[in-house]
Structures are given as C-alpha cells and as structure tokens.
Amino acid sequence: MDLVRGLHNLAPRHRGCVATIGNYDGVHLGHQHIIAALRERASSAGVPAVVVTFEPTPREYFEGAAAPSRLTRLREKLEALESCGVDRVVVLRFDDRMRSMGATEFVDRLLVDGLAVRHVVVGHDFHFARRREGTIETLRAAGA
C-alpha cells in the first residue's frame, strides 16, 4: 500500500483513482462496507482504491484535549486499511488551511487537480469542507 502525506506530495502518478474520504478511526464494519464498495468500483475502473484521511482528526483539531480518544493510532489505521485491500492512503494535515477550505476548493484542489478521481464512495451522511458545507450532492454536482 502506498502512503502519501500531504496535498503537496501528490504527484502525476497519483492521478486517476476511486476514492473515499473520512477519518476511518477503528475501521469498523461500516467502514469495511464502504471500502469493499470502493475496491469493487476501483477494480471495475482499473484504477487504485484510495482512502483520504486527516491528521489530526477534525475533532482533535477543533476540540483539542476534549476530543474523544482515538480507537486506533495512525499506524494502526494504516495497517487496518492495508489489510482491507486499499491501494493508497492520502493523509492530509488538518490545520487552519484545511479548516477554512470550502467545498468547491476541496473538490477542485484535491479530487480534481490532485487525484483526478473517477468516482467517490462515501457513506449516506457524508459531509466535508468548511463548516461541513460539502455533501453527497456537492460531489454529484462536481461529477464525482
């Protein structure tokens, strides 16, 4: 499994994939279901299955010491994702820049320019970007 740390480390060879986005703490049964769908979609398209996750988690960023404890450390999360058959994990630093990024910029910079995603696989209650403004409908409108 490949590991890419930071948006700035995405290279042309990382373009073209099916991706999912989330914290993936614990990689529980719900996560495993999403990852299975991700792998199936990626296999059908002949591209890598990619998980995009954040370090620290958004809750840790916003809540600091009051944030709930993680179920898994980053290394354990990466091992669990690898055992689920993920081809690549992109770990994005959750900082002031990421916090303030709007949904359109997130889609454009990461999903279009950075990863050239063919499809995004997420859960039914997925939200992303500044103030959780991005939704599944945002992704659909962008063609992901």
Where are these regions (language model features)?
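Nucleotidyltransferase catalytic core that binds NTPs
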Residues: 1-144
